[in-house]
Each structure stands twice: as structure tokens, then as C-alpha cells.
């Protein structure tokens, strides 16, 4: 799950760059939402994915 969170975080960042650059103005809002959703998923994956020794 951590791998997927990182992949979608990168996709969201690319979409944000395109959206904020004026290439696709309507994609900026979607990119913000996706970015924060997968940022939360990344944090959850890091915290829950730790193996206790």
C-alpha cells in the first residue's frame, strides 16, 4: 500500500504542476484533493507498516 501511495502522490504532483502552470486549469483543484488524500494515505502506510522488533 505504501508503494501505491507514493505512486499516486507523484501522479498528483505532476497533475498539480500541469494545473498550476495553466496547461489544465481545471485539473488544479482535482490535483490538490488527490495530493492531500494520498499524502494522508502515505502517512498512514508509514505508521501502520512499521514492523515491531
From Swiss-Prot:
Coiled coil: none annotated. It comes from the Bacteria. Keywords: Cell membrane, Membrane, Transmembrane, Transmembrane helix. InterPro entries: DUF1328. GO terms for cellular component: plasma membrane. The chain crosses the membrane at residues 4-24, 28-48. It is found in: Cell membrane. Its main location: membrane. It is a multi-pass membrane protein. Belongs to the UPF0391 family. HAMAP family: UPF0391. NCBIfam families: PRK13682.1-1 (NF010226), PRK13682.1-3 (NF010228), PRK13682.1-4 (NF010229). This is UPF0391 membrane protein Patl_1732. The lineage of its organism: Bacteria, Pseudomonadati, Pseudomonadota, Gammaproteobacteria, Alteromonadales.
Amino acid at each position: 500500500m505504501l508503494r501505491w501511495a507514493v505512486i499516486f502522490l507523484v501522479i498528483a504532483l505532476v497533475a498539480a504542476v500541469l494545473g498550476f502552470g495553466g496547461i489544465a486549469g481545471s485539473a488544479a483543484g482535482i490535483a490538490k484533493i488527490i495530493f492531500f488524500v494520498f499524502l494522508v494515505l502515505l502517512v498512514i502506510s508509514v505508521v501502520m507498516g512499521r514492523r515491531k522488533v
